[in-house]
Design a protein with these regions (language model features):
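Active-site cavity-forming subdomains of large catalytic enzyme subunits
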Residues: 1
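Anaerobic metallocofactor- and corrinoid-dependent redox/one-carbon enzyme cores
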Residues: 4, 9, 15-127
Length: 127
């Protein structure tokens, strides 16, 4: 049954067309699976930087909203604590393929999550 499926969605290399082709298609799949009690997980938190509010606006409740904010902020803090720039995305390959800004890439990432409510947030543990 679909309720036993858990699908993780990862960036496979974005270009100028993925935001109008593959990513929306994956989002539709995500919505269909969730409608059948399946689960999808949007991975690669740094890929969300720049479009995270789209996910936050879909959080099912205040607790999940706060967890999502915490997840994003923890990743940003991790980057800055290691002297890494947060907004050094997209990659040269993304740019060559037609993506010019972080927001372009991030919008593509969040499209893969579809439009269903965000019902959970897996927080990362630091070691």
């Amino acid at each position: 049954p679909c309720s036993e499926l858990i699908i993780g969605m990862k960036c496979g290399g974005s270009d100028g067309l993925s935001g109008i082709t593959a990513n929306p298609t994956v989002g539709i799949f995500s919505d269909l699976l969730i409608a059948q009690d399946g689960t999808t997980i949007l991975t690669e938190v740094p890929e969300m930087f720049g479009a995270e509010t789209l996910l936050m606006n879909r959080c099912e409740n205040e607790e999940i909203f706060e967890q999502t904010v915490c997840l994003i902020n923890d990743f940003k803090e991790y980057f800055t604590s290691h002297h890494q720039t947060i907004y050094e995305n997209p990659s040269p390959g993304n740019k060559k393929g037609g993506i010019s800004t972080l927001e372009d890439k991030s919008l593509g990432c969040t499209q893969k999550s579809g439009s269903a409510p965000v019902r959970g947030c897996l927080l990362m543990e630091r070691q």
